[in-house]
């Protein structure tokens, strides 16, 4: 008879802590992985997210978001994206999410008001299997599907927003175990500076870690002791290039733990 060989994990004798968290086996522990790219960072620090530009502008107050697409095929019965999941934090920094039915270039308001936008992803799509245009979450006047102020977006072909930034929910402490910067620019003698920045509630952004590398390389930082971030702290990866125009990607891994397990 064939013999079944059970692994240590299967028999329950040992399993890595990080895997237990990812499997939802440890109460009040959550796993968070963030990544984003800025296709053209400047000579001063730029936030690494797919909205580009220099530094990301956060909402000053919780606001209803307008969800729209640059393409008319992203609609409830279209060939592109039909519904998207929006996730973020409310005015009290509590986690909230909702599913929004798209209406092409016409904006659809969220039910919730968001103080922080975390991510957005396509849930259902038509025959195309993907979003036909760029999908936006923002505020202000919407022109051809593009809001005046953008807080998050899904790039065509990705089906999910990308951003190397995140805010710690109320009642939790976040612990960063690693972060990475990668530059795809192979032009010789271009130097990339990476920065991990955080802003405590009511404070200003300060640098927590930095790196330097030549373009076309990656820099991985694994913390021997995880870096702790208090509730309501904004966290983001930034990069600068000695010559403007470099594409830089950033990613980080966090485990966030409830401060009072009895709450």
What feature does the model see in each segment?
Residues 2-116, 123-263:
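Beta-strand-centric surfaces of beta-sandwich/beta-rich domains
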